[in-house]
């Protein structure tokens, strides 16, 4: 019997990676169809190899993508399908608005250097990837009746891709794309300051493109400060380690900075040490602006309810707090004002 959801009301999710939210069945299907070897040939085995039950280091977690990304990348049908199925997955979880993020380059096999996942040159460019994801998301919106927008990721280790990400954000602005992100390994020394990233984020500011940055997940508060002061981020992806710098944390509290919190993810990636109190408890107690998110549900074998159950059972979160954080998520979403207002009105109505 399925357990009762911890929060059985409409939810908003702002931090989830498309390439970390693929159905194992779909990976198997395209592995067979494209003749690409996978480490397992049943859904159950594949879920256990790709999935995690206990904490791994961040590199150990990132290695999981190597198993299945070659099966999806460079395949038009697969790229569109994972976007469509993502919307179905979120609709089933009771999400009414979600922002999903991905790197166009990591799903391409043409006009991308270096070539990801040891693929041979094909004909799917980063621009094609965005177009295909948009098609899948928009068809999913029609079929499942929820609203979905997308965020394009720059990668910390590939600053040479970032200006193209900016151009794609401009080209597809409001055609599902609402913002830019910086993802990848934040422990790469000085990566927030790589000229490619800085220039892309400056361009985003100039062009009115919204901005979020992964920072303070496993990195120091300094990475969060760089994200805010240099990259001019409007939201912080994770941000747990911000609380180690009281002055910075208090400043961001005053500025109403939004933290995209992923509790179950932070346990499995080792971003949070379970012997300590989770930063989200501090955020709750300080009435900070934050949301709850899945991050990579395929790898964490989770749904959004996993994160709600964890905070409810282990951290004493209440229904009132769940309402508050979802309203904050809607307020901090990258929707245009009119659509944001509609979303908020819906939440207020359903939360009464």
Swiss-Prot record:
The keyword Repressor does not apply. The keyword Membrane applies. Substrate binds at residues 17, 19, 184, 296. It catalyses: adenosine + H2O + H(+) = inosine + NH4(+); 2'-deoxyadenosine + H2O + H(+) = 2'-deoxyinosine + NH4(+); cordycepin + H2O + H(+) = 3'-deoxyinosine + NH4(+). It is a peripheral membrane protein. CDD domains: ADA. GO terms for molecular function: 2'-deoxyadenosine deaminase activity; adenosine deaminase activity; zinc ion binding. One of its GO terms (cellular component) is cytoplasm. Its EC number is 3.5.4.4. Keywords: Acetylation, Cell adhesion, Cell junction, Cell membrane, Cytoplasm, Cytoplasmic vesicle, Hydrolase, Lysosome, Membrane, Metal-binding, Nucleotide metabolism, Zinc. The modification N-acetylalanine is found at residue 2. Changing residue 296 to A: Reduces affinity for adenosine 70-fold. Reduces enzyme activity 110000-fold. Optimum pH is 6-8.5. Interacts with DPP4 (via extracellular domain). Interacts with PLG (via Kringle 4 domain); the interaction stimulates PLG activation when in complex with DPP4. Catalyzes the hydrolytic deamination of adenosine and 2-deoxyadenosine. Plays an important role in purine metabolism and in adenosine homeostasis. Modulates signaling by extracellular adenosine, and so contributes indirectly to cellular signaling events. Acts as a positive regulator of T-cell coactivation, by binding DPP4. Its interaction with DPP4 regulates lymphocyte-epithelial cell adhesion. Enhances dendritic cell immunogenicity by affecting dendritic cell costimulatory molecule expression and cytokines and chemokines secretion. Enhances CD4+ T-cell differentiation and proliferation. HAMAP family: A_deaminase. Belongs to the metallo-dependent hydrolases superfamily. Adenosine and AMP deaminases family. This is Adenosine deaminase. It comes from Mus musculus. The lineage of its organism: Eukaryota, Metazoa, Chordata, Craniata, Vertebrata.
């Amino acid at each position: 019997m399925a357990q009762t959801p911890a929060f059985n009301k409409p939810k908003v999710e702002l931090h989830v990676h498309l390439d970390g939210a693929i159905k194992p069945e779909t990976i198997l299907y395209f592995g067979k169809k494209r003749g690409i070897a996978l480490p397992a040939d049943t859904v159950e085995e594949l879920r256990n190899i790709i999935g995690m039950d206990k904490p791994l280091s961040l590199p150990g977690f990132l290695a999981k993508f190597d198993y299945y990304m070659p099966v999806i990348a460079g395949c038009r049908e697969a790229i569109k399908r994972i976007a469509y199925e993502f919307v179905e997955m979120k609709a089933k979880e009771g999400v009414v608005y979600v922002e999903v993020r991905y790197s166009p380059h990591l799903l391409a096999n043409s006009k991308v250097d270096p070539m990801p996942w040891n693929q041979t040159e094909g004909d799917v460019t980063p621009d094609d990837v965005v177009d295909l994801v948009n098609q899948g998301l928009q068809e999913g919106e029609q079929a499942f009746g929820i609203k979905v927008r997308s965020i394009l990721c720059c990668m910390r280790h590939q600053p040479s891709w970032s200006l193209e990400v900016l151009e794609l954000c401009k080209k597809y602005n409001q055609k599902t794309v609402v913002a830019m992100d910086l993802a990848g390994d934040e422990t790469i020394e000085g990566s927030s300051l790589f000229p490619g990233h800085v220039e892309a984020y400056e361009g985003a500011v100039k062009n009115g493109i919204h901005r979020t940055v992964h920072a303070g997940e496993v990195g120091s508060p300094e990475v969060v400060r760089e994200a805010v002061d240099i990259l001019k981020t409007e939201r912080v992806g994770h941000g747990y380690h911000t609380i180690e710098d009281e002055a910075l944390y208090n400043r961001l509290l005053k500025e109403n900075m939004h933290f995209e919190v992923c509790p179950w993810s932070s346990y499995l990636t080792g971003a949070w040490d379970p012997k300590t109190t989770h930063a989200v408890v501090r955020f709750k107690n300080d009435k900070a602006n934050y949301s709850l998110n899945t991050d990579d549900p395929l790898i964490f074998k989770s749904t959004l309810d996993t994160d709600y159950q964890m905070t409810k059972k282990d951290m004493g979160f209440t229904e009132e707090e769940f309402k508050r954080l979802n309203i904050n998520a809607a307020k901090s979403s990258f929707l245009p004002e009119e659509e944001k207002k509609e979303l908020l009105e819906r939440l207020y109505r359903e939360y009464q």
